[in-house]
Every structure is written in C-alpha cells, then in structure tokens.
Amino acid sequence: MAFQLDFGATLADEIVGGREERAQIADVAVERHRCTVVAFVGLAFEARIAAGPGVHVVCRTAGSELETVAETAVRRGYRGMISFGVAGGLAAHLRAGDWVVASAIHDSHGAHSNRSTDVVWSRRLLSLIGRAVHAPIVGVDTPVAEPAKKRELHRATGAAAVDMESHLMARVAAEHKLAFAAVRVVVDPAHREVPPAALLNMRPDGRADTRAVMRDIIARPSQLSPLARIAMDAFAARSQMLRVRRLLGPSFGFADA
C-alpha cells in the first residue's frame, strides 16, 4: 500500500527516473488551465507525477490539514478532489501495476463506514485508463504489511486495495460537497510481505529517509531480498503511474466527466 511502497517506489523514482519530475511540489497551474481539482497524495514522488494543468497537488505531510485544503478548494471554486497514488493489493488476483478505481471508500472499521465516489467521474477514469478494476478501496491509519492481515482486511471490508489517504479525503470531500474519486495502482500484491525497513523510510516532507533504511538493512540483512522484490514491484507501479497520468490529462479527466 502507499506507506509500504514508500521504500520501493521512492527508490525506483530516485534511481531510475526521478529526473523526469523534479519540479517543486506546489500549487500547480498552467496559465491556460484554471485549477479545478485537488489531488491528494501520500508521497513526494506521487506528487511530482500528479502535477499538471488544472490540478492543485497536496502531499500528505505532518503539516497537511485536509480541512484547510477543502475550505481553500471551495473558496477558490475547485469542483473535485481525487486520491491518487499507490496502494496495497487485497484482492488475490491483483498484481503490481494493476489499477483500482474506487467504487466506494471504506475505513478499517468495515463497510458500515462506506463513502461513495462520484459515479460519472469514476466512469470517466475507467474509460481513460482502459484496464482497471472498479471496486472499493479501504483506508487505514496504520500499515498493513503482512499477507495474513491483508486477507483479514479483505474479508472484513470486501475492498480490493488499501491505502492511508483515501478515507480521509473522502470524508472531507463529502463534508464540503465536493465530487470525489480515487484511483490507485497496486504496488505490493496481497501475497507480498513488506519488510520492516520499508516502513522506516519516510521523512515529514514525504521523501525517503535512505539512511534509516540502510541502518535497518545492516541490522537485519535478511530483508535485502524482500526489499529487492518490493523495488521491482515499485518500478512497475511507477511506470504505470506515469503512463496513466498522461492518459488522464488536465484535471484528471474531471472537466470531461
């Protein structure tokens, strides 16, 4: 899921292709396109990919206050909020690089805390991506790294994927009567266990704390092989994010929904 992919995807981003999106994370607007949607992400590399015409990107950091973001969005006339980035797979058939467009958002308490997504916008996302699963996504507040816990969460919620942002944004969007959608790419499949070092890497600004990861690898070198697998999965997920972001175009397809 998003927190888990922090290590692998950020590693892939920095080593393989980070030069493509070194632009500063900021209010992103191109002169010809008024910002119409807020894209909420959890990681710095996701923010770089999400940036584009018609999009105000917010990276979830220690200082990110969603209520303030939503109030600003309403005041500036934004019309939608989208949760974009990586997720952990819960459905057994999903592999790294597979897409999930949320039909609803649950939280870890189960389906009774269900929040709907915008039907028209979600259909537009499905059409633009071309190959994606339309299913619930569950949001959690703490990492879900073990396959057994992923299976348990899937049974409890019926969700196909899990992240740590969508449930927060869905709640705020509903409170402020903004259209909401979520589109996430799987990085760690349901069968993949995420090693402890992969959970240590994030700094408050959403970037990788490589030193913390390396210290943990030195202390527990048996993690090296699992981390290599995560990095390969993350590369597949990141490649898909770059491809799909181009397909979604200005405002993540919202203007055409």
PLM segments and residue spans:
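N-terminal hydrophobic/helix-forming segments and targeting peptides
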Residues: 2-21, 26-29
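Glycine-rich phosphate- or other oxyanion-binding loops that anchor nucleotides, phosphorylated ligands
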Residues: 3-8, 32-257
